[in-house]
Amino acid sequence: MTMTSTTTKAMAMAAAVLAAAAVAATNAQTCGKQNDGMICPHNLCCSQFGYCGLGRDYCGTGCQSGACCSSQRCGSQGGGATCSNNQCCSQYGYCGFGSEYCGSGCQNGPCRADIKCGRNANGELCPNNMCCSQWGYCGLGSEFCGNGCQSGACCPEKRCGKQAGGDKCPNNFCCSAGGYCGLGGNYCGSGCQSGGCYKGGDGMAAILANNQSVSFEGIIESVAELV
């Protein structure tokens, strides 16, 4: 078998692996207490029913971890609890990300400086579904994801589609049948208007790139070793 045919076969197999991983990661991935405490990748919310996604259905009532609309308690005010998804615990005992949480008095987590985004940074999006606040800084928690949130895991969700003059969602999120931006089956499934909608696997690559830590090169190398 030639090197060219081996590489071609490896790439074909890798593409199939990526497609399967995307569907599993964003359509049926379970988390939280329903799956041994598993954390969703890239700050996706784990819903009360144990599924990964973004939007009110996942980040609202009962949200177990991730970019939950209500900040979880932590630190000395939360019985010594640490934050999920490597978020910071603020001096007041709330989980989030950004200077209000990771700055002065931060109790645990990756204390760090703010990342600029949005209209004050040439439209830059925040990494890992973090919210871009109305002031143009990346973070998680009500100060970033609440009023004026420009992109990311905003609470409440941004409106889109025919219910919002044809607007599309930022971050390539899905626009649900009801006109709300988010990720997961409730947004990308039946009736999805735009974004990475589930259509027999079509459109999944963009969601995979934004929300799943999978290296295409790594898969190529791994598969090549098997052929």
Curated annotation (Swiss-Prot):
Keywords: Chitin-binding, Disulfide bond, Glycoprotein, Lectin, Pyrrolidone carboxylic acid, Repeat, Signal. InterPro entries: Chitin-bd_1, Chitin-binding_1_CS, Endochitinase-like_sf. It holds the Pfam family Chitin_bind_1. Glycans are attached at N211. Confined to root caps, several cell layers at the periphery of the coleorhiza and radicle, and in all cell layers of the coleoptile. Residues 202-227 form a propeptide. The modification Pyrrolidone carboxylic acid is found at Q29. Substrate binds at residues 38-40, 90-101, 142-143. Disulfide bonds join C31-C46, C40-C52, C45-C59, C63-C68, C74-C89, C83-C95, C88-C102, C106-C111, C117-C132, C126-C138, C131-C145, C149-C154, C160-C175, C169-C181, C174-C188, C192-C197. Residues 1-28 form the signal peptide. Residues 29-70, 71-113, 114-156, 157-199 form the Chitin-binding type-1 domain. The keyword Signal applies. GO terms for molecular function: carbohydrate binding; chitin binding. N-acetyl-D-glucosamine binding lectin. This is Lectin. It comes from Oryza sativa subsp. japonica.
